[in-house]
Amino acid sequence: MNGDIAVFAGNSNKQIAEEICTHLGIQSGKINLKKFSDGEISVKIEDNVRGKEVFIVQSTSAPANDHLMELILIMDALRRASVSSISVVIPYYGYGRQDRKVEPRVPISARVVADLIEVVGLDRILTMDLHADQIQGFFRVPVDNLHFAPVLAEYVNTKKIDDLVIVSPDSGGAERARAFGKKVNGSLAIIDKRRPKANVSEVMNVIGEIEGKNCILLDDMIDTAGTICKAADVLLKHGAKSVYCAATHGVLSGEAVDRINSTQFSEVVLANTIAIPESKKINKLKSLSVAPLFANAIQRIHTNQSVSTLFD
């Protein structure tokens, strides 16, 4: 990698940024990030970046508002420093779940965040497993949406799990589960959630054969872990031999870690798109690095090669 490229990291996930730089064979850019006494964010770029192709690595994870504001201030500082281009690497795109109006008088937050980022000025977005594909259309610049599936499939295949079933926790994720099943030679099952009538508890039914099978619950994120833990209990109740869980983004808010710990998961596998604090690291959690994938994509962008061929 030549000296015409620079990678800067915000505070949200410095570890993945450093791993990306290691794979690219460069040092991360020097940046001074701090807060004033009133809570406002201060940004100063310490390197000369004039004419450089710049990549900013920043997930908009919790605290989402601070990390989002930090990102757009870094973007503005670099733009005013006369860089040649800005690509924003957002391993986890926060506010992505509010991608449409589901009831009257609510915002489409994913679009608002896209507008905020775009109005500051950038040339490209690089992200991973957006909650909704239509978010790519909220930007007028190119959006490369990378996928955790190849990294996860390689890991699962090394475990050599027999009688494998990939389970979608809802009907909306069935296509994701089916596609992943082809990568790991697993069959498909779906958990169908229904509420028979008002004020009656939600009922979970399993569509597919899971008795005596090893199941992997597959989702794009784990937030409070309520749904995924209930789904695991249902699978075990229906005779599953073991239950694993895999998701790209480990949001792990609220009592998520306690719920995971008290559920009979064999293992919960996450990408490292969100930094997990030490207080939330438990034996059941396994983190797989997607830094090499991001580094490869950055290399391809820099050399004007196809990014999509990474997943052919």
UniProtKB/Swiss-Prot annotation:
**Could you name the active-site residues?**
K193
What are the binding positions for Mg(2+) 1 in this chain? H131
Q: Which residues bind D-ribose 5-phosphate?
A: R195, D219, D223, T224, A225, G226, T227
**Which CDD domains does its entry note?**
PRTases_typeI
Q: Give the protein name, as stated in the record.
A: Ribose-phosphate pyrophosphokinase
Top-tier EC class: transferase
EC number(s)? 2.7.6.1
**Purpose:** Involved in the biosynthesis of the central metabolite phospho-alpha-D-ribosyl-1-pyrophosphate (PRPP) via the transfer of pyrophosphoryl group from ATP to 1-hydroxyl of ribose-5-phosphate (Rib-5-P).
Q: Which gene encodes it?
A: prs
The top of its lineage is: Bacteria, Pseudomonadati, Spirochaetota, Spirochaetia, Leptospirales
Q: Which InterPro entries match?
A: PRib_PP_synth_CS, Pribosyltran_N, PRibTrfase_dom, PRTase-like, Rib-P_diPkinase, Rib-P_diPkinase_bac
On the tree of life, the source organism's domain of life is: Bacteria
GO cellular component terms listed in the entry, alphabetical order: cytoplasm; ribose phosphate diphosphokinase complex
